[in-house]
A protein has these predicted regions:
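A residue-level marker of the well-folded mature domains of exported/periplasmic proteins
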Residues: 1-159
Length: 159
């Protein structure tokens, strides 16, 4: 149960997939209300997200008015966490995606940024190499989407 702000960048193919998954999942939880989805430009996502969230906090000053921020990648999550920290809104949780170093450090430090999903680049490369190897030896390659396992990073396992 709660209210969520989504920070997105739908022009990016990878980010749009995350946003579509978020859209599908949030529909399954009628007690979670999406307050707004805000487009974050790719050029300065930390600063832009910080400004966006600061403005949303001003417009929604009550403690229960915003309970979470979904950021479709880590840089806006970092900006959101900074805005929340400056506003003294420790109760709002932030999540991101990518597992970048700054985000993991903020998670370890116990900020509002509580989780990120770390991409498995080695696993992705393994899938690509396996498919190329099959192609080169004349075997049938897999069709459709393939997924490498990803890791949820929280304060308990952040390194």
């Amino acid at each position: 149960k709660g209210t969520v702000i989504a920070l997105t960048h739908r022009p990016h193919p990878g980010v749009v997939k995350r946003c579509e998954a978020f859209d599908d999942i949030i529909k399954e939880y009628p007690d979670i209300k999406l307050i707004t989805e805000q487009h974050v430009p790719a050029e300065q996502p930390i600063n832009d997200a910080q400004d966006i969230v600061a403005n949303l906090l001003t417009a929604n000053p009550d403690k229960d008015s915003i309970t979470a921020v979904f950021a479709a990648w880590d840089e806006p999550a970092i900006g959101a966490a900074k805005a929340l920290q400056e506003a003294g809104r420790d109760e709002v949780i932030v999540t991101g995606v990518d597992g970048n170093e700054q985000a993991v450090e903020m998670i370890k430090d116990g900020t509002n940024l509580k989780a990120t999903v770390k991409q498995n680049f080695e696993g992705m490369a393994d899938i690509v190499c396996e498919q190329m190897d099959k192609y080169f030896v004349g075997e049938e390659i897999e069709k459709g989407e393939m997924y490498a396992p990803a890791e949820l990073i929280t304060q308990e396992n952040a390194q």
